[in-house]
Amino acid sequence: MRLLLIHSDYIEYEAQKKTKMAEADPVPKDGMTEALTVFTAVEAVDEEDIDDVVAQSVAEIEKTATQLAVKNLLIYPYAHLSSDLSSPEAAVAALSAIERRLNETGRYEVKRAPFGWYKKFKLSCKGHPLSELSKTIVPGAGAAVKEKKEVTHEFFVMTPDGERHETGEFLEGRFGALVKKEIGIAEPVGGEPIHVDLMRSKELVDYEPASDVGNLRWLPRGKIVRDLLADYVLHMVLEYGGSPVETPVMYDLGDKAIYEHADKFGERQYRFKSGNRNMMLRFAACFGMFSIMRDMHISPNTLPIKMYELSTYSFRHEQRGEVIGLKRLRAFTMPDMHSLCLDMEGALHCFEEQLRLGWKSGEDFETELVGVFRCTRGFYEKYENWVKSIVAESRVPMLIEILSDRVHYWIAKVDLAAIDGQGRPIENPTVQIDVESSTRFDIKYHLDGEVVHPPILHCSPTGSIERVICALLENTANQSVPQLPAWLAPTQVRLIPVAERHTSFADELCTRLNKAQIRTDLDDREESVGKKVREAGMDWVPYVIVIGDAEMETGKLTVTIRKLSEPRVPHKEQLDVEELITLVRTSTDGMPFRPLYTTRNLSKKPRYI
């Protein structure tokens, strides 16, 4: 139900023309002075529990009337507040019940404008800060109108030895940047993050002006990095025992469970109308996977069930001013795994395993991660030794946040973050223990004749693909010679012939290396060798080989290795072709491979930006 409450000098209405849904015997003309006018729309989802919605609405109206010291109340049906209305019968029943219950208190004079009539009205709003209020009433939990719990937050740092420390002892370095942000003492930093310029100058990603803000166009060099990262997560999840699925990007808000889950995210959604159905674009893959789990026949001996989807795309309607580069988008790619566990003991075990995946992703991306563990006080008191064990296994200090009560679907979670070039966290991998969604979506199994709604783990082993690339680019700010891990480099080897007579040899070598699954291109442009070498450096190519007479005669290649180089001091090694192949394969061992996404001859390569 949607309410718009207006503190009015006066409200006057007059019924003009009835519709097919019109109430019989209306009061055709009426009004009130010094009143609280309650414009009301009853929604389709309210029909799940009309009594509960009415009770919540009455409580909200009474609360506002008390704040404003108002005794006159006028209930005004106003369909324009919602695009997903209930049946007329349900609406009349709800409006009549609200009117009746308010009258029964004996504290108010209550009137109700007729339902199903076109009406003209005049209203004067008082214009003070509380004179215009809007409320959304959610059936069932009543989350929209319940008083918010007073939740306190306690922070401390736990070291791998299990000792507890004050946060003030850990305010330096990357971990210190996370601590300062979480406890609210980080100093504001101006300017764009470093990656915003890099993503364009390296021809990875660009803004798409013809789309909504926060939607990007992926260029070939960026597309291959994105696809390799997606391959990486898929391989990781498959090795872990996950089962890939694919689910829709849009969902019907008429489904109560979906409506309630979506409503927790407030206005950060893309909502639209499809015929008579009120729809939304997903902001995570939860909806589809929970729907699959709800329809499954689950036996205790099949648990845990680990379900995975690369959510391409998920959508969040972030504030325009908050959208920036690859860090905060309105459309993004999220590797999303949900694990249905037997019980809490099973959930804790899966949590440990999935946290290891998160730490491993940082190692494989050559990006240092720092962590914060969050949980309710009740959880911490019960599982303190377990918390100490996961910090010990992580081998680094972790910030601990203790919430006095549960305010989300999770009772415990860990967030791992990279730190950008300006000292700001980029939250990436996460694991969460969800104790709410299996009940909401009716995901269950039976044990000893009892229905069990088990805990569900939410896990993104890497965080969004876009934020991974953001972290990789930001990481270069701390490198003396900026580079991506070799397995992610759009071009892994670049061949630079000195003269035209060397091009044929270089071309044959290029073919051989590409067949060996090494992304290799050939700079056959009519430019100086010096310029070609400089541009290979600007492209962050890990291995650069200049080919002249000596290379053709001896077969020995002078390879500049970027990872071992220093500014103005290139590291060079003499290698034959097989040694080169072994070197590159060793540096990319165990990582996914894709062939070149750009033309291998640079003379034919277009510029994208």
From Swiss-Prot:
Comment field on protein domains: The N-terminal domain is an archaea-specific tRNA-editing domain that hydrolyzes incorrectly charged L-seryl-tRNA(Thr). Catalysis of tRNA editing is performed by the charged tRNA itself.
Covalent S-S links between cysteines: none
Function: Catalyzes the attachment of threonine to tRNA(Thr) in a two-step reaction: L-threonine is first activated by ATP to form Thr-AMP and then transferred to the acceptor end of tRNA(Thr). Also edits incorrectly charged L-seryl-tRNA(Thr).
Gene designation per UniProt: thrS
GO molecular function, one term: ATP binding
Protein name in the entry: Threonine--tRNA ligase
Subunit structure: Homodimer.
Superkingdom, taxonomy of origin: Archaea
Binding residues annotated for Zn(2+), in chain numbering: C286, H338, H458
